[in-house]
Amino acid sequence: MGYRKLGRTSDQRKAMLRDLATSLIVNERIETTEARAKELRKIVEKLITLGKRGDLHARRQAATVLRRVEILNEDETTQFAIQKLFTDIAPRYTERQGGYTRTMKVGPRRGDGSEMVIIELV
């Protein structure tokens, strides 16, 4: 099986994964279901690899996935999620060849018993 359908149509699934990828880049740690985290991991690994490349084409490819979200930094300046990926996150992993994310099981969700995990950047 190449991918999970996650109970959605293709455009809904793509939009959800874009939102999750942007949230993970901005917050560096999110809680989601296990199936979503496994699909999200594929996308984020590719984004960080693009960030490590750092050229204009890689930046444009990453911009097709990430949403245009402004982030307020500690020093009162703002930057976009794409800038954070290329300036803050990608330089951390110059020596690492893949494996940029970690998932930790949290337990079942109270409402429907779905297995929840925390996915974070290593």
From Swiss-Prot:
By what name is this protein known? Large ribosomal subunit protein bL17
List the PROSITE patterns hit by this protein, alphabetically: RIBOSOMAL_L17
* Listed HAMAP family: Ribosomal_bL17
Q: Has UniProt tagged this entry with the keyword Metal-binding?
A: no
The gene is rplQ
Q: Which organism is it from?
A: Macrococcus caseolyticus (strain JCSC5402) (Macrococcoides caseolyticum)
Report whether Ribonucleoprotein shows up as a keyword of the record.
yes
Classification via InterPro entries: Ribosomal_bL17, Ribosomal_bL17_CS, Ribosomal_bL17_sf
Biological process (GO), any one: translation
**What's an example GO cellular component term for this entry?**
cytosolic large ribosomal subunit
Q: Which PANTHER family match?
A: LARGE RIBOSOMAL SUBUNIT PROTEIN BL17M, RIBOSOMAL PROTEIN L17
Listed SUPFAM superfamilies: Prokaryotic ribosomal protein L17
Q: Which domain of life is it from?
A: Bacteria
According to its UniProt record, which protein family does this protein belong to? Belongs to the bacterial ribosomal protein bL17 family.
Q: How does it assemble?
A: Part of the 50S ribosomal subunit. Contacts protein L32.
Drop me one GO molecular function for this one. structural constituent of ribosome
What does the UniProt keyword field contain?
Ribonucleoprotein, Ribosomal protein
Q: Name one Pfam family in it.
A: Ribosomal_L17
